[in-house]
């Protein structure tokens, strides 16, 4: 899934005009560009969590609200095409990093604070979390971008 999600986003948005990428489909919802910015910021943060778990012995990490991450990155202000290409490159680096891990590294842990009680998480937990989190957004994006059904203009005569 981690490998497929950027490709699915690219497939769903291929040929989409710029105004559609930056247009809110429904009042109060995110634009296509906002969704990509959110996924990039989550991937950055969870990738850093996994790297910290491997670099340190059971580090304590502070969870950050996804909306805060989104605002800190500036990804929303980027043009969609270059941002998607950056996401694809970032994902390739993350996958190369994860594929090189020895089996025992997937169980390395961290204590995560913020957003509730402290909890212990593993590298595997965050890799799975990221894949499932993205998949939900990609599915929603696919539904949002589906063309509206054609209306039957015949009057029944």
Where do the language-model regions lie?
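Short acidic/polar alpha-helix capping motifs at helix-coil junctions
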Residues: 11-15, 58-60, 75, 145-146
